[in-house]
Design a protein with these regions (language model features):
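Internal, glycine-rich beta/alpha segment that forms the wall or movable "lid"
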Residues: 1-81, 85-86
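C-terminal amphipathic alpha-helical "assembly" element
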Residues: 8, 91-108, 112-219
Length: 219
């Protein structure tokens, strides 16, 4: 939680300081190792002796009050409620659409407590692991590499398989439509098997998704 507090401070203030449980910005007693009067004359948070009391980021964010925040791979109500405080958008890669309905509802209610009016569909981003191929059989054959990797690595760290969007374009479109009928979705988040599939496999999958799946949802 504290790192989000630090990020929000940095995005909403020209300069800031933070003394927390895990993070301290700037470090206590920090001295600019490159003394020059320009820092104190034209900068902020720097004294003539080059001691630094506050830091900032530049250039400043274009969006107000700050760019959209995203919470990676939310799988609990607690996490959804945390991000709702900041109108941050959790990413939910869930197969269980009843679970998604609950997440969306809990998020909206919690966001309202902090004065955030959430547009339907902005409660969370929904999606999954995407492999798009000419046929369902071909996509499933490509998925075998992912299944092997997941069993050998993430699963042993307690990380379950995300929602699978694996199949031909029409199959993926039906999956997305089913989710969109359950909860409003404005953003679809796709995991792609970079590092496991070849460049050509991934590019073909993305091309099929972009030309055969997305047009089915254009306004």
């Amino acid at each position: 939680e504290e790192f989000v507090e630090v990020v929000v401070k940095a995005l909403t203030n020209e300069t800031f300081s933070h003394q927390g449980t895990f993070w301290t910005f700037p470090p206590e007693g920090f001295i600019n190792p490159h003394p020059h009067s320009v820092y104190a004359d034209y900068g902020q948070g720097v004294a003539p002796d080059m001691s630094v009391s506050e830091i900032g980021i530049a250039p400043r964010p274009f969006q107000t009050p700050f760019p959209q925040l995203y919470g990676g791979f939310t799988a609990s109500m607690t996490t959804a409620k945390f991000w709702a405080q900041y109108a941050g958008r959790p990413i939910v890669l869930a197969e269980d659409l009843d679970f998604c309905k609950t997440i969306w509802s809990v998020y909206r209610d919690e966001a309202a407590k902090f004065g955030h009016d959430i547009t339907p569909g902005d409660e969370a981003g929904w999606g999954g692991l995407m492999i798009c191929a000419e046929t369902d059989e071909e996509a499933q054959a490509q998925f075998a590499d992912i299944k092997w990797f997941w069993d050998k690595w993430p699963e042993q760290f307690g990380q379950g398989m995300p929602k699978l969007l694996v199949g031909a374009p029409d199959t993926l479109a039906r999956e997305i439509e089913a989710a969109a009928n359950a909860v409003p979705i404005n953003e679809c988040f796709l995991l792609i098997p970079q590092g496991l599939h070849t460049r050509d496999q991934i590019m073909h999958s993305l091309e099929l998704f972009g030309t055969k799946v997305l047009p089915q949802f254009s306004a």
